[in-house]
Regions:
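Conserved beta-strand edge residues that scaffold enzyme active sites
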Residues: 17-18, 67, 185-186
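A structural signal for short, well-ordered beta-strand segments and their strand-loop junctions
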Residues: 10-14, 60-63, 181
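Glycoside hydrolase catalytic-domain groove-lining segments
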Residues: 22-25, 29-65, 69-72, 76-152, ...
Length: 223
């Protein structure tokens, strides 16, 4: 709330979730898991935060795992209920990094190698589940996109500006118009942002399509 008095009109929270690094048996939670679920606790925190900030006309946004959009197991484990959090947050920022999806999610052999299809599928799922809310309850969606390579993913190719731009186009094609880029080294490719029209350059489209086909063929032949 103090940030509002310093001139900020939106506060974005990250890590509003339970840990994925330790087992529940290794943690002493100060609540009865038999009467309260992780999702209930996180949702209540989001509601409380949004109400506090809303009282001072501050927009409240929250980062969430991209997989919680339509994966009930992940949602339950980290406590992020995409729809319920969306009822209170002004904006949700799902981290729909293609590298963070397992093989065959959205029927993609290696989602990392299909940046357009992976992001489009995730955000179409976002549209579908959030449409269960009334128009007044529905949050804005501003997705996090991948501007980095993922060498830890088996069979993953090195990301190029075309891969980044393909994800941006997927945002527009899914019906959204806001996005964020992430790279832990804080190095972003300006060439990936060269189109100001929201249209993907035909040369980049061809690059991405050729690469996706080549990567799919390579995976199939390895099998």
């Amino acid at each position: 709330v103090r940030a509002a008095f310093d001139g900020f009109d939106e506060i974005q929270f990250d890590y509003i979730r339970f840990s994925t690094e330790v087992k529940d048996s290794e943690v002493n939670y100060e609540f009865d898991s038999k009467t309260l679920s992780k999702r209930q606790i996180i949702t209540e925190f989001v509601k409380y935060s949004a109400e506090r900030m809303g009282a001072h006309n501050i927009e409240f946004s929250a980062d969430v795992f991209g997989t919680v959009i339509d994966n009930d197991v992940d949602s339950r484990d980290v406590g992020q209920d995409y729809v319920q959090m969306g009822k209170y947050a002004n904006t949700l920022s799902p981290m729909v990094y293609p590298s963070h999806y397992n093989k065959m999610v959205y029927r993609l052999d290696i989602p990392n190698n299909h940046p357009y299809k992976a992001v489009l599928s995730a955000l179409k799922a976002s549209k579908r589940v959030l449409d269960t809310l009334s128009v007044s309850e529905r949050p804005n969606v501003r997705a996090w996109l991948q501007d980095f390579s993922a060498p830890w993913v088996a069979g993953a190719h090195k990301y190029t500006p075309a891969d980044v731009r393909a994800q941006i186009q997927a945002v527009y094609d899914a019906g959204y118009d806001e996005w964020l880029l992430w790279n832990a080294s804080i190095r972003y490719r300006e060439s990936a942002l060269k189109s100001a029209t929201g249209k993907l350059d035909s040369s980049l489209v061809n690059q991405v399509e050729k690469k996706e086909k080549a990567d799919s063929f390579a995976v199939k032949t390895e099998k």
